[in-house]
Swiss-Prot record:
Taxonomic lineage from the root: Bacteria, Pseudomonadati, Thermodesulfobacteriota, Desulfuromonadia, Geobacterales
UniProt xrefs under Pfam families: ATP-synt_B
Recorded GO CC terms: plasma membrane; proton-transporting ATP synthase complex
Subunit structure: F-type ATPases have 2 components, F(1) - the catalytic core - and F(0) - the membrane proton channel. F(1) has five subunits: alpha(3), beta(3), gamma(1), delta(1), epsilon(1). F(0) has three main subunits: a(1), b(2) and c(10-14). The alpha and beta chains form an alternating ring which encloses part of the gamma chain. F(1) is attached to F(0) by a central stalk formed by the gamma and epsilon chains, while a peripheral stalk is formed by the delta and b chains.
Protein name, entry field: ATP synthase subunit b
Keywords: ATP synthesis, Cell inner membrane, Cell membrane, CF(0), Hydrogen ion transport, Ion transport, Membrane, Transmembrane, Transmembrane helix, Transport
Annotated TM spans: 10-30
Function: F(1)F(0) ATP synthase produces ATP from ADP in the presence of a proton or sodium gradient. F-type ATPases consist of two structural domains, F(1) containing the extramembraneous catalytic core and F(0) containing the membrane proton channel, linked together by a central stalk and a peripheral stalk. During catalysis, ATP synthesis in the catalytic domain of F(1) is coupled via a rotary mechanism of the central stalk subunits to proton translocation.
Family, as annotated: Belongs to the ATPase B chain family.
Family annotation (PANTHER family): ATP SYNTHASE SUBUNIT B, CHLOROPLASTIC (PTHR34264:SF3)
Native source organism of the sequence: Geobacter sulfurreducens (strain ATCC 51573 / DSM 12127 / PCA)
Length: 206
């Protein structure tokens, strides 16, 4: 029992209570001893003292039990407080976990939206690049067609110009050759005759 009291921290209160009870018992014994000096009452006094001592022991045991019960009640209260603190800590931890999960869900949603926006921007850029590529190709085709048409027109003009120059040169050569042939065909006498006929015609006109 003493070990149980010591283990639960009740030994000092129990010893203090026992000391008080023994002090009271000693005081009572002294009072009985001083008041009962006659031999006839010695046997009764011894029985009374023995009975009183048992009462004191019972009282001490009862007091110890009471002290132990009070201490245990305090221990239960402390345990209850500790349990409440543990429950509070667990509740706060659960709330913190819930808040963290909520934050994680929010950030995950924001990250997903950001990824979708990035994908959309990338798709728009790629589409814009394809449209720009098609536009450049179309402009290049138009430019090439214009250059081809311009080259064709220029070539046609050059051909026509060359043909005209060839015709002019051919005509000039033809005239020159005709004159040369005519000169060679007309003789000196024919020239004199032609001049004489021409002069006669002029005179007749006057």
């Amino acid at each position: 029992m003493a070990y149980a009291f010591k283990k639960n921290g009740l030994l000092k209160p129990f010893v203090s209570t026992a000391a008080i009870c023994l002090l009271v018992a000693g005081t009572v014994v002294l009072c009985h001893a001083s008041g009962g000096g006659e031999g006839a009452h010695h046997v009764d006094t011894g029985k009374q003292m023995k009975d009183f001592m048992w009462r004191v022991i019972d009282f001490i045991a009862l007091a110890g039990v009471i002290v132990w019960a009070l201490k245990k009640a305090n221990a239960k209260g402390a345990l209850a407080d500790r349990s409440a603190n543990v429950e509070k800590a667990l509740r706060e931890a659960e709330e913190a976990r819930t808040a963290a999960e909520k934050k994680f869900a929010e950030y995950s949603e924001k990250l997903e939206k950001a990824n979708q926006e990035i994908d959309g921007i990338y798709a728009a850029i790629r589409k814009e690049g394809e449209l720009e590529k098609e536009r450049i190709i179309a402009e290049a085709r138009i430019t090439a067609e214009k250059i081809r048409e311009q080259a064709t027109a220029t070539a046609t003009q050059e051909v026509l110009k060359a043909r005209a120059e060839l015709r002019d040169e051919a005509a000039r050569l033809a005239v020159q050759m005709a004159e040369q042939a005519l000169r060679e065909a007309i003789k000196k006498d024919d020239q004199d005759r032609l001049v004489s006929e021409y002069l006669t015609k002029v005179e007749n006109l006057h």
